[in-house]
Amino acid sequence: MNKSLSKNLRRYLCLTVTIVLSVSVSAQKDFSSIQTGVDVGDANIIESGVKSFEEIERRLPRRANSFDDDNSEHHATKGWGLDYEYYKYTYPTINTKGETIILTALAAMPTNYDVPINNIILGCHATITDNKSTPSEYIKSGDWKTDVGMLIMHAKSKSASELGYNCLVILPDYQGYGNTRYQAHPYLAQEITARQSVDALRYGIELYKKSKKGRAKIRDGWKTICVGYSQGGSVAMACHRFMETNFLDKDLHLGGSVCGDGPYDPIATMKFSVEEDKVFMPVAIPLILKGMLDYNPYMRRHKAKDYFTEKFLKTGILDWIELKEQNVLDIQKALRKFYKFHKDKRGDYLKASEIFTPEVFAFMSKKIKGEPTEKNPKFDDLYSALNVNNLTENWKPKYPIYLFHSKVDEVVPIGNAESAYQRMRTDKNPNIIKYTYVESGGHIMSGLAFFFAIFGKSYEQKAVEAIAGGERTWNLFNP
């Protein structure tokens, strides 16, 4: 090769490397630039350690007021991206009465401090009925194939260009789980769950900010992205809405939300169950009703017996929900001791008319058909309580939302996604909501399709990356 050409080529390569490194360094900022509006002194680390993405490692219980990094085990020692750092912490928030309560959450982050944090993922877990399935318990006995396991994968160390990885992941337990497991969970009480989850996010950021020097900075242009499936899908959307409507979107760099098969419209969900007279996940109905009876101002004057048949209540299902010892499948199995389940091509189900009293079933049947109903406080209050938690009403999002839904979801019908898309998008901003409707797969299989991909990237990962890249990548995103 010509010496002059070789020399110029070396200079060009050196200059290119210098520019790339310069851009890499300058395109970062310190976490101290993030304004959360909360005091880190009110939060506490109660457990921390390093866990492998390949195997469960030994817990390292500690206490602190920051994500401390002076532990030698808090660094990748098994190769690029094989470990993540976790922290279980408590933080203050409020309940439906405006009283201060202390909740738990889990934070996960890369062990490689040389690559900047790309984004912050607010991971919202799906419907659970047992405390062992909470995010903070995942570090002890969780299965990586669950939604929590998949959300934690965003903390995996990879190249800085992989915007779906190298993330700080915050996973709230929700009220009624973790250290409040003996309290009722406000199931589908969207605003309060969103408030509590966003508080977990804010305190998680503050704990990271107070860590010692050496921890990774965050990329310039980072986003907070709310992600979840099933109940987690609706909580993700509710958190998105809460940040927008409470002026937290700028400080927290809200990017948008990625929502899979979520019950955004409780009326649409109830309509499906009553019209078909089929409930494929029977525990969902008492979860919804119990949450409203415990926390909704419309419903506090009523009792469970006002809505459920005596036979259904005698199964002990409300006790199972309160104890939080049995998971959803355990409860489904326990109900078989009292009921003979029916079956169609989508799976096993109980009739809605076997769960609701005849009066409630008749009222709901008329209401969803638009037929006149007699005035009755306990029925009218039920409908009002369902409607007040409808995320698709009275809100036009300013930030992107990706909806994923199975057209044949037997638990959370496609009407939820259609309601969100039709009511929340506008002609002025038609691309603010994008969606993928898959042709097959019930609620469980749809969740696998959302988080997993045999080849290439999953729907969830592609949507996270589209939002993380900003307006240009979102506009190019064609799900």
Give the positions of each predicted feature.
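Short beta-strand/loop motif that positions the catalytic acidic residue
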Residues: 397, 402-409
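C-terminal catalytic histidine-bearing segment of alpha/beta-hydrolase fold enzymes
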Residues: 271, 378, 383-386, 411, ...
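Alpha/beta-hydrolase active-site loop
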Residues: 149, 187-211
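Short alpha-helix in the alpha/beta-hydrolase fold that links the catalytic acid
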Residues: 239, 399-400, 413-424
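Short, surface-exposed "cap/lid" segments of acyl-processing enzymes
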Residues: 96-104, 108-162
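Catalytic-loop region of hydrolases
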Residues: 28-114
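Accessory cap/linker subdomain of secreted extracellular hydrolases
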Residues: 260-394
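Acidic catalytic loop of the alpha/beta-hydrolase fold
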Residues: 266, 407-412
